[in-house]
Amino acid sequence: MDRYQATFERLAAQKQGAFVPFVTVCDPNPELSLKIMDTLVQAGADALELGIPFSDPLADGPTIQGANIRALDSGATPDICFDLIGQIRAKYPDLPIGLLMYANLVYSRGIENFYQRCAQAGIDSVLIADVPTNESAEFVAAAEKFGVHPIFIAPPTASDETLKQVSQLGGGYTYLLSRAGVTGAETKANMPVGDMLAKLEQFNAPPALLGFGISEPEQVKQAIDAGAAGAISGSAVVKIIESHLNEPDAMLTALANFVSSMKSATQK
């Protein structure tokens, strides 16, 4: 069975939502990044959302831009990232793993080659932040050819037509934006999202995970109470990495504590 579907069904049976942390692979370096991803899963993450380092991350605020710079400075390449992700996949065969990235990285490898490499590494889904549904045909075709879910963003300003496309084209989960703008924990997530969730359900969309500005357990609880299948937290996780760069043990402990507190807020 599909890993996302299996995870959402298991969580529903346990009356829980999903908590999904985001990190940039190879931040702050490949060796520690592997430990970070492992720590997130051990602490209770239901899935991982991973960034491949890129020199010009348009939709990201300063926190995730910093992660990209650290990773690139440590010598990160897409191949090193795929190798690390493959190691996490081997250790956690049932864990949904998604990429969140930019089209340039896909184009530079060739669209088909890129998705084939994702499939080889055991990646379940790819969200390309700068490709809207109406420009996505080539990406969706390649993703589906290699058994990778194409993920789409449902922004708060979306028309019914956009939400319909997101629902029909997407697989795995739907990335529901809690607000417009760039990523960052400084800007709190806006609730309510009930109307959006009702429309996505009406269009039979994949389960919605709420992202952007999720940094506290209370926000996770609100997202799930509103009807989302779970929440994604990126900048808040990366901030913990950023603030413990010289003390890896303290970093891993702080990450574990954060994930565990966010995960405990998913119980319905």
Curated annotation (Swiss-Prot):
Instruction: Give the EC number(s) listed in the UniProt record.
Output: 4.2.1.20
InterPro entries named in the record: Aldolase_TIM (IPR013785), RibuloseP-bd_barrel (IPR011060), Trp_synthase_alpha_AS (IPR018204), Trp_synthase_suA (IPR002028)
Q: Name one Pfam family in it.
A: Trp_syntA
**Underlying gene:** trpA
What name does this protein carry?
Tryptophan synthase alpha chain
Question: Subunit notes for this chain?
Answer: Tetramer of two alpha and two beta chains.
Q: What does this protein do?
A: The alpha subunit is responsible for the aldol cleavage of indoleglycerol phosphate to indole and glyceraldehyde 3-phosphate.
CDD domains xref list? Tryptophan_synthase_alpha (cd04724)
State the organism's lineage. Bacteria, Pseudomonadati, Pseudomonadota, Gammaproteobacteria, Vibrionales
